[in-house]
A protein has these predicted regions:
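Glycine/threonine-rich phosphate-binding loop and adjacent beta-strand/alpha-helix elements that clamp
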Residues: 62
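Hydrophobic faces of well-ordered beta-strands that scaffold small-molecule active sites
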Residues: 1-2, 76-79
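Short glycine- and Lys/Arg-enriched binding-loop motifs that mark or flank ligand-binding interfaces
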Residues: 5, 9, 75, 112
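Aromatic-lined glycan-binding groove of carbohydrate-active enzymes
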Residues: 1-23, 58
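Flexible loop/turn connectors
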Residues: 81-84
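Terminal-tail/helix-coil boundary detector
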Residues: 23-54, 69-73, 87-129
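Short, flexible segments with low predicted structural confidence
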Residues: 19, 34-35, 57-58, 76-77
């Protein structure tokens, strides 16, 4: 079961280097979400937006469709409190990514270096335990 299949919201395409989070938002302590790192990491999201537009989908739908295409036993479980996000989440199941699409996504992702650790140092020590 993928944890945070939208990269804590980053793959929705709505977060960039100008985004501010509420003071209590966990992303404030995540190195990957510093302004500098968001600025560097937005390159993949911009590519994802373009790819999604070609598929008449949102970046979030493509991210979920990609996960669904990986293995039949991989099931992203999205969380939402908004009706329109629920509809968007369900729409990902209707997107068929071809083998060529998957190669294109993988190629784009491999060409972009992700900046910043996924968790603060103290939490990284607990990953994969």
């Amino acid at each position: 079961m993928p944890f945070s299949p939208l990269g804590k919201g980053f793959l929705t395409g709505t977060i960039d280097d100008k985004t501010t989070f509420e003071p209590t938002d966990f992303r404030n302590v995540v190195p990957r979400f510093t302004e500098e790192n968001r600025k560097a990491n937005v390159a993949f999201v911009e590519w994802l937006k373009t790819f999604a537009a070609r598929k008449n989908a949102t970046p979030a739908q493509i991210a979920r469709a990609w996960l669904l295409a990986q293995k039949p036993w991989i099931v992203p479980i999205p969380g939402t409190t908004k009706r329109h996000r629920l509809d968007e989440n369900l729409g990902a199941a209707n997107i068929q990514l071809t083998a060529a699409d998957l190669r294109e996504i993988d190629r784009a992702a491999s060409q972009i270096e992700v900046h910043g650790a996924r968790y603060p140092e103290a939490l990284l020590k607990m990953v994969d335990r």
